[in-house]
Swiss-Prot record:
InterPro entries: ATPase_E_C, ATPase_V1_Esu. This is A-type ATP synthase subunit E. One of its GO terms (molecular function) is proton-transporting ATPase activity, rotational mechanism. Belongs to the V-ATPase E subunit family. Residues 27-49 have a biased composition (Acidic residues).
Length: 192
């Protein structure tokens, strides 16, 4: 075998090996490209899912916020209606006069008088009820009309001797009744 043949065989072998390496390299490059494309697709898919999740979350938050605002607006409107009704009731109570006012005032004083022994008891009421109170208090021993108080009517009865103070004003009765019946009032007004 000649040297040229050996060189040629080595070259052929080197070319074959180079072709094999090139082929393996191209195959590996294709695998890397395929893997990179799959990873890129996965990244895009994940980004799309994340974007959809964020959009859904924002939509839910905005919807929740809108519902809360609507609920607050309804509650505010209801509160305003309840205040108007309360104010109307107060006005109607303040307008009670004549025999009805006297009967109510006497009844409230009777209830309060049970708490006192009759020693220097002062009865306070609305300033416009001074004459009415003078007439009613005359029927009670040890009771006298005191200074007027800011109220719709009724009486505030107190005694220094017993340190007892009974608030039987129309206002206090209204507030008690209002608080006790607020659910029912609300249900009737708003058909709940």
């Amino acid at each position: 075998m000649s040297l040229d043949t050996v060189v040629e065989d080595i070259r052929d072998e080197a070319r074959a090996r180079a072709d094999e390496i090139r082929s393996e390299g191209e195959e590996r490059a294709e695998e890397i490209i395929d893997e990179a494309e799959r990873e890129a697709d996965d990244i895009v898919d994940e980004a799309e899912r994340e974007a959809e999740r964020k959009i859904s979350q924002e939509r839910d938050q905005k919807l929740s916020s809108a519902k809360l605002e609507a609920k607050q607006a309804r509650l505010e409107a209801r509160r305003e209606v309840l205040e108007e009704v309360h104010d109307d009731v107060e006005a109607q109570i303040a307008d009670i006069d004549g025999d009805e006012r006297e009967a109510l005032t006497r009844s409230l004083l009777d209830a309060a008088a049970e708490e006192f022994d009759g020693d220097s008891v002062r009865v306070h009421g609305h300033e416009d009820d001074a004459d009415l109170l003078e007439g009613i208090v005359a029927d009670y021993d040890g009771f006298e009309v005191g200074e007027p108080v800011d109220c719709l009517g009724g009486v505030v009865v107190e005694s220094d001797a017993s340190r007892v103070r009974v608030n039987n004003t129309f206002d206090s009765i209204l507030e008690d009744v209002w608080e006790e019946n607020l659910r029912e009032i609300s249900a009737r007004l708003f058909e709940e």
